[in-house]
Amino acid sequence: MYKHNLKKAFLAIAIAMATSWSTASAQLNDYFSKPASATSTPDDKGFIRRWMLLEPIVKENRTNIVFTDSYLRDAFNHEYFKGQKTVLPKDGAKVKVGDETLLWHSLESNLYNIKLFRFGEATKSRLYGVLYWAVTVVKCNEDIPNVRLAVGSNSASMWWVNGEETLLLSGDRRMVVDDAMSHRITLKKGTNIIRGAVINGPGMSDFCLRFVNEKGEPIKNIEIINPR
């Protein structure tokens, strides 16, 4: 009788675990898919949907009013893991942050905006008081001068293009399309590495990003070549 009950208990635990993972997968599939091809292009409005996302790093913040320029530069320039501004991550790669081991995920968003909160939820990560890292690679067939990086994020964020700080969105903010734009830059012929960090205390986390020309029109003649 004891062995029978023990067997039933183990079976119940196994079913619960399987259901939990299935639910997490379904949640992820609601917002993301695994890249099906080696390259992709921006959507019809120019938004870049393919990203390498790192599971969120714990960064204690009970409020977002602390997100001043100086606070953010300290937070974003702190080294949480080796090569965070130089390494091009691959899907499934692991990084060590303190006592935690976090994974990189190559994902294609089903929406124009990247739902970081849902990503964290699906990977069973902490949801509040966190910092997300995102990386994508843009390939150009020729130099594209005088473009602007246009970003909306919830909450604050910082963005680098080819290793240069290009845009900072400070303060407690909601995600709004083209909420902030960079100075004019040139996307060079070949590969351009885009890195971003998004920080949030309480509330949802997401971002949207595209490049626009001097008329404010989206740049679409580029390829996204993140490793799968």
Features from the language model and the residues they span:
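Bacterial N-terminal signal peptides
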Residues: A12-S20
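Short beta-strands within extracellular/lumenal beta-sheet-rich domains
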Residues: Y128-K139
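Short structured motifs
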Residues: R118-A122, W133-V135, D178-S182
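Beta-strand-rich ligand-recognition modules
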Residues: V161-L209
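Aromatic-lined ligand-binding clefts that engage carbohydrates, nucleic acids, or primary amines
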Residues: P145-W160, I194
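Non-cytosolic beta-sheet module surface loops
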Residues: C140, L149-S153, V198-N200
